[in-house]
Structure formats: structure tokens, C-alpha cells
Amino acid sequence: MAVQGFQRRLLGSLNSTPTAIPQLGLAANQTGARCLEVSIPDGLFLSLGLVSLVENVLVVATIAKNRNLHSPTYCFICCLALSDLLVSGGNVLETVVILLLEASALAARAAVVQPLDNVIDVITCSSMVSSLCFLGAIAVDRYVSIFYALRYHSIVTLPRARQAIAAIWVASVLFSTLFIAYYDHAAVLLCLVVFFLAMLVXMAVLYVHMLARACQHAQGIARLHKRQRPLHQGFGLKGAVTLTILLGIFFLCWGPFFLHLTLIVLCPQHPTCSCIFKNFNLFLTLIICNAIIDPLIYAFRRQELRRTLKEGLTCSW
């Protein structure tokens, strides 16, 4: 395979020299043609990773501290934050080790680096898969709370939520282990791509259905109070914008990475695909950006969580 889904960069760093200053420019691909390559500075990548780590640690600590936040909804949000934390942590750890190896500040043998690389890859991959799963779980939780409001607490119970969380983590680790072990098999990569597309479609269908129900509810309230039609139109427009932002961020941050995996299967030697492969680190950076955005969308917008976080920060000072 021309390009691996998860590059084995640690082993390659044992005998490498420090890279030049990253830049945006044209690079030659395998056929000698010119293509656009976006290189991400290590400092920027590490900074984004640290921001994500801090944000998601705050979310996990806040939910763990307040017993009022130990509901199924917040459990899913907490696990999403934990997954994003591991995504960022795995990439930051790998980057730091690579930089130390390149600077000859860390002496290591291939026999030691290989298992470390495998462990980091499994952690990163499993946290990516679990992050997608918990995004879907949050969407399902919201859907049930809207369409089955009266039976929500009997349907989405804490024991069931814990069982779902355990199943997601176990499945993510098992699948990621297989993915890392058989990364050069097209079927494994296609399974991961199909999983992403299924999650995207499921989230889009659920949120569009929720938006339609919300618009119907707003229209009913407007008729009850004999309000004007523009109010309903404004609500629908606001909901559509929110939905577009939510799904747009999800697709923008995750789509390029899974496009990368798809092209590995479809055209591993094609010049155009080779140009796209050169931007793998950019695709990882977009996933880190998603780990930064997730707490802003799913956690910090909730008043109870913000209040608990504010109290915790105030007491710490």
C-alpha cells in the first residue's frame, strides 16, 4: 500500500533528520507532477492538542464532580470528552516522541519503539471510533427525549446507558486492534469508511427529523397565540443554521480523513491521490480541531455544567 491509514512515523524517526520548517507549497508526487501540500507546524499541532486536552479534561472533571450530572445524557457527553481527550493525547504523545527522537534527545531501539507505536495507534484509533459512536449516541439520546418525552426516563435508564457505553468502548478497542493489525487489507479500511458514512447518515436523519418536529411545535405555539408567520419562519431558519453548522463541522473535520482511507483502497498509485495522501497530517489536525469544538457544542452550552465548572474554577483560585 502506498500510504498507510495510520502512518508508522515513530520507527521512521529513528534514522531521520529534523524536518525543515513546515510550509504551504507545491510538492512533487510519485510521477514528478506538482501538487499542493499543506504542512502543519509541530508547534501548531501540539498547541491544538493541548487546548483539546485542557477542554476535555475540564468536561470530564466537571461531570465527575457534580452528582446531578450523572444522568445518561451527561454520561454520553463525558465519554465523548474522554474519547476526544484520548485522540488528542495519543497524537500529542506520538508527536513529542518523534520530536525527541529526531533531536536525538531520546535514545530508543526499534524493538522498543515498535510496541510503543502499536499502543499509541490502538489508543488513537479506538478513541476515534468511540468518539464517532458517542456522537451518534448523543443524537439518539436527543431524539428519544423529543419523540418519546413521556417515556424517556423509562427508555434511557442509567444502567442501559452504562451498558451502551461499555459496549461502545469494547467494540472500539477490538475493531481498532484489528484495524492496526490488518491496516493493509482493503476490506478493513472499507469497513471503517462505511462506518463513518453510516454514522453521518444516521446523525443527519435524526437531527433533520428533530428539526422538523421543532418547527411543527413552534408553528403550533404560534397559532395558539395568534402570532405572525415570520416568527415561525425565523425559528425554522435558526434551527436550519444550527443543524448545518453541527453536521457541517462533523463532515469537515472527519470527512477528509475518511476520504484519505477511501482513496488508499481505490487509487493508491494514482498521481492525484498521491497528492491527497501528502496532506495526512492536515487531516489529523482537523480531527484535533473537532476534539476542540465538541465540548463547545455538546458540553459548555449546558447551563448546569457551566455553573459547576465556574464554581470549581472559582474555588481553585
Curated annotation (Swiss-Prot):
Keywords: Cell membrane, G-protein coupled receptor, Glycoprotein, Lipoprotein, Membrane, Palmitate, Receptor, Transducer, Transmembrane, Transmembrane helix. It is found in: Cell membrane. One of its GO terms (biological process) is adenylate cyclase-activating G protein-coupled receptor signaling pathway. It is a multi-pass membrane protein. SMART domains: 7TM_GPCR_Srsx. Pfam families: 7tm_1 (PF00001). Residues 1-37, 94-118, 184-191, 267-279 are extracellular. It comes from the Eukaryota. GO terms for molecular function: melanocyte-stimulating hormone receptor activity. Residues 64-72, 141-163, 212-240, 301-317 are cytoplasmic. The chain crosses the membrane at residues 38-63, 73-93, 119-140, 164-183, 192-211, 241-266, 280-300. Glycans are attached at N29. One of its GO terms (cellular component) is plasma membrane. A lipid is attached at C315 (S-palmitoyl cysteine). Interacts with MGRN1, but does not undergo MGRN1-mediated ubiquitination; this interaction competes with GNAS-binding and thus inhibits agonist-induced cAMP production. Interacts with OPN3; the interaction results in a decrease in MC1R-mediated cAMP signaling and ultimately a decrease in melanin production in melanocytes. Belongs to the G-protein coupled receptor 1 family. Receptor for MSH (alpha, beta and gamma) and ACTH. The activity of this receptor is mediated by G proteins which activate adenylate cyclase. Mediates melanogenesis, the production of eumelanin (black/brown) and phaeomelanin (red/yellow), via regulation of cAMP signaling in melanocytes. This is Melanocyte-stimulating hormone receptor. It comes from Hylobates muelleri. The gene is MC1R.
